Amino acid sequence: FEYVTSHPDNIMPEKINPSEYMLLDIEGKKNKTIKVFNKMMDCKDRADVMSYYNATLYKHPNRNLVIQPFPLMDYILYFDLDSKNHYAVHQSGTLSFDDYAPSITMDTKAHFSSCVCTEDYFLILYFANRTDNNQGPELLAFDWDGNFIAGSRLSDYCLNIAYDSAEQKLYGVNPFRETLYEFDLNSFITK
């Protein structure tokens, strides 16, 4: 898989406990358990807390590495599924999994969005530092060890991205204007 997003059919917030992830084989038998969170975040509305944990998984093209950036928090979780190397990159001073989760409103700030993965790094859209809603997100690049490589503000708003590694072109779509953008990344990441 390239990426996986969870969409539960029936949400029972009082029964949700994402403190660990289970890796299951094709028959549904548990292969591995990965302890991720100490406990659920406290929140006034338990239905809101699920939104903080609902995040897409993105996989390295060839290795058994998976990342999970969180749309409503400054967290990226890293999982090396062949070892016990699991860790988080978190911007200090921002909401953490040990904090009280505020209720979700129209003013709740988005953080991470669409992501594309290459052999050497992944590119991800970051919205938290925008000064207005029409401003383009930042494009951030990280290596697979969690190190920040490069970052730049995109000139136009886009929500989803795709990447052509042969041409080093990033494509972004603005769903509100029905516009497709092409960004040349030849000088963005240098080896």
What is the predicted function of each stretch?
Residues 162-191:
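Blade-level signature of beta-propeller repeat domains, shared across WD40, Kelch, NHL, RCC1
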Residues 21-25, 135-147:
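Beta-propeller blade signature
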Residues 105-142:
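Loop/turn-rich, solvent-exposed surfaces of beta-rich toroidal or solenoidal domains
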Residues 10-12, 66, 122, 170:
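Hydrophobic beta-strand positions that form the internal "hydrophobic ladder"
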Residues 1-7, 49-64, 69, 107-118, ...:
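Structural signature of eukaryotic scaffold interfaces centered on beta-propeller domains
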Residues 29-52, 85-107, 156:
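Surface-exposed loop and turn segments in beta-propeller and other repeat-based domains
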Residues 14-20, 72-75, 129-132, 177-179:
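Short glycine/acidic-enriched loop and turn motifs that connect beta-strands
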